């Protein structure tokens, strides 16, 4: 264990997802040996992100303005809405270049064990978006794990009375995996082969 601010830095870096103690230590010593201008730039960017980035008022994706670039793009198909758990999932699907509709970011998935229920997600906002009848197809692109499946089933049942076609990404994605780790080809095929959910 180190003393003072270097240990504080290691501890803070270790709180980041995917960064274990060894990685945190390696990053801390990289920062320590880096040019002060690089470190200053990193600090500025971190602060800038916290100050300038917000969530899109429409879909919940990350944005620098009130609307994200996807919601602001009139070329996107407003009749197809893809529901994802997190903004990183939007990026994963966008990389496929197969989807031309719009998104709705839930902000997570239903997970009773973690104390996350439907009221903790952006489901109310989703229903508001569906209310005007513009959306004809709702693609449920939640992660193919227990929480993602539970969320998809919940949403499918909730939306069924609205008469919107509800589909789920096709298989091919590994069960228990996260969308952000799927390669573009697999994710693209999953989008092409999506199926309707019968609940």
UniProtKB/Swiss-Prot annotation:
Keyword Amino-acid biosynthesis (UniProt): no
One Pfam match: RecR_ZnF
Span of zinc fingers (C4-type): 56-71
One example GO MF annotation: DNA binding
SUPFAM superfamilies attached to this UniProt entry: Recombination protein RecR (SSF111304)
Alphabetized UniProt keyword annotations: DNA damage, DNA recombination, DNA repair, Metal-binding, Zinc, Zinc-finger
Top-rank taxon: Bacteria
Ranges where the Toprim domain occurs: 79-174
Single biological process term from Gene Ontology: DNA repair
Annotated NCBIfam families: recR (TIGR00615)
Cited function: May play a role in DNA repair. It seems to be involved in an RecBC-independent recombinational process of DNA repair. It may act with RecF and RecO.
Protein name stated in the entry: Recombination protein RecR
Organism per entry: Acidothermus cellulolyticus (strain ATCC 43068 / DSM 8971 / 11B)
UniProt lineage: Bacteria, Bacillati, Actinomycetota, Actinomycetes, Acidothermales
């Amino acid at each position: 264990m180190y003393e003072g601010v270097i240990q504080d830095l290691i501890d803070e870096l270790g709180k980041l997802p995917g960064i274990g103690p060894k990685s945190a230590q390696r990053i801390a010593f990289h920062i320590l040996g880096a040019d002060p201008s690089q470190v200053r730039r990193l600090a500025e960017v971190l602060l800038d992100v916290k100050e300038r980035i917000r969530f899109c008022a429409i879909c919940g994706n990350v944005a620098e303005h009130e609307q994200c670039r996807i919601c602001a793009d009139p070329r996107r198909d407003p009749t197809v809405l893809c529901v994802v758990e997190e903004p990183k999932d939007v990026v994963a699907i966008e990389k496929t270049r197969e989807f031309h509709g719009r998104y709705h970011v839930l902000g997570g998935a239903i997970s009773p064990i973690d104390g996350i229920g439907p009221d903790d997600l952006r489901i109310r906002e989703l229903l508001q978006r569906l209310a005007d009848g513009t959306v004809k197809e709702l693609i449920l692109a939640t992660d193919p794990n227990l929480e993602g499946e539970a969320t998809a089933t919940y949403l499918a049942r909730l939306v069924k009375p609205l008469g919107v076609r509800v589909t789920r990404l096709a298989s091919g994605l590994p069960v228990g995996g996260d969308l952000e780790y799927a390669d573009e080809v697999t994710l693209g095929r999953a989008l092409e082969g999506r199926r309707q959910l019968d609940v």
